[in-house]
Amino acid sequence: MSDPVFFSSVGPILLAEVAALAGAALPEGLDRELAIRGAAPLESAGPDDLAYMDNAKYAEALGLTRARACLVSPRFAARVPEGTIALVTPQPYRGFAKVLARLFPSAARPTSLFGATGVSPGSFVHPAARLEPGVVVDPGVVIGPGAEIGAETVLAAGAVIGPGTRIGRGCAVGPGASVLHALIGNRVIIHGGARIGQDGFGFAMGAGGHLKVPQVGRVIIQDDVEIGANTTIDRGASRDTIIGEGTKIDNLVQIAHNVVIGRHCVIVAQVGISGSTTLEDYVVLGGQVGVVGHLRIGMGAQIAGSSNINKDVPPGARWGGTPAKPVREWFREMTTLKRIAARERLAEDTAE
């Protein structure tokens, strides 16, 4: 359940609107004035709340819920208890997300920590920077010369926007984030502590010492990208580091110089992608995946968590392990190792 200290609901919202947002049908004869005021999990939802259910593991909780209404897939509709209104939709979780965004708009992206509007007198905006109407700038923000900030963008306390950096419209930059040498599209969310556009890790190694290679590329982030807290994206060495439209990046991810990430990829926490690697569209990297440099991961490929990628991955492949390989091969290897280990333990026990 949401804590009103942190997230205030804009409810009530009529169930008719909930159904429209979620792509659900209202039951026939339902009172058109019925509404919800909040949203909560099945087990804690009350008579003013909306819940959702799309996993058989929660069938028992569904049967006991006290929610006013519940978004469910057709297979679970008959299990909704009396007193709770079943809103049947093919995608309950996606529908629930849309309703949450309507109920709690301030939770959808970083906002001003002070509920402020306009430019705070405690910020520093260089006279040569250009801000479109509706930009919110919190105390402690620094905006360098030549930077451009699009309309309705929010820069939270302590954010640093470097010289010449361009940020599109409807974006949000969280507390303490820095954005340098970068071109940012529209509706991009950058969470607190993220670092974008700093030096890539480039050195000409040699016995006489490691000579730093100047990094003169940029970071380009396309529309509707989300970047998690404390994620780092290095600028390119001599070409650009690029994050494609709609890609979602979790917290604590490292993306090295010259990496190109396609559209609508998903990159989970603690992934490290080495320099000059390319991810095509719709790639998914599970948590703690490591990717060697100068590789290509094909469109739609999925990599299991904690895997290490040391060669190109074909489009649509599902790989896992260290070094990573097709999951069926990986599973066979693990099963074989388990059997060998069991035989060895049996032999040792027999010898004793």
Curated annotation (Swiss-Prot):
Q: Recorded GO terms, molecular function? A: N-acyltransferase activity
Biological process annotations from GO: lipid A biosynthetic process
Which CDD domains did the record assign? LbH_LpxD
Purpose of the protein: Catalyzes the N-acylation of UDP-3-O-acylglucosamine using 3-hydroxyacyl-ACP as the acyl donor. Is involved in the biosynthesis of lipid A, a phosphorylated glycolipid that anchors the lipopolysaccharide to the outer membrane of the cell.
**EC number, UniProt record:** 2.3.1.191
User: Which keywords appear in this protein's UniProt record, sorted alphabetically?
Assistant: Acyltransferase, Lipid A biosynthesis, Lipid biosynthesis, Lipid metabolism, Repeat, Transferase
Which residues are named in the active-site annotation?
H257
State whether keyword Nucleotidyltransferase applies: no
The protein's superkingdom reads: Bacteria
Protein's name according to its UniProt entry:
UDP-3-O-acylglucosamine N-acyltransferase
PROSITE patterns in the record: HEXAPEP_TRANSFERASES (PS00101)
Give me the Gene Ontology terms describing cellular component: membrane
Q: Do you know which InterPro entries this protein is assigned to?
A: Hexapep, Hexapep_transf_CS, LpxD, Trimer_LpxA-like_sf, UDP_GlcNAc_AcTrfase_non-rep
Q: Which organism is it from?
A: Methylobacterium nodulans (strain LMG 21967 / CNCM I-2342 / ORS 2060)
